[in-house]
């Protein structure tokens, strides 16, 4: 692999390469491993990486978000790999884990590289990849999606609510890295996730109105909003968006901008009163 092929795309989690078949062109376990490491690191909060390198933060794994992000990728890789192995899609367990882990890291970090055609994978593997495409990496990185920070807080809110139901008189606080999260922050996280899913649903419905099948419509909208790149169906990891109707391409372009600007940054442009 030449240095210009994919190094910058991996660091920036942008996914662009010089080959039509992406990283599958090289068919190298060594290249896959190096790129996986690069993508995984690029999905961590850059400020946290800098603080760790300069000695201001002594252990990057002390961060709850980092542990959640890396742990999620590990669990998802194991689930997908075992699913592919038991379905006899790949001849050996290590081979299945190799392709599974690369694809999981790629979609979670929203890099969009591919080493295999995930359209032929098992339904369980596809569901896990969809989950990864929604959650994605940490805030403060170059990745898109809902972000691990928000999803971790959402899970904490659900757990706290269940505990509150069991102990109505208890005073429960939600903490992140030892810091109590204010209600305003929790409300904003909930609002963002609901709004994100609402636009995802709207984009899916809009695409189906123009004859695009449901899987392609959903995955294209999801991949566009999360800036992931590849989806499933007509926009699978070994395909592209060229075959979609022009109006659907415009819709997905809008979703890309919406997701990249964290939704509310773009919505404000349409409300002149907010400019004052």
Model segments located where?
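Membrane-proximal intracellular helices of multi-pass ion channels
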Residues: 4-276
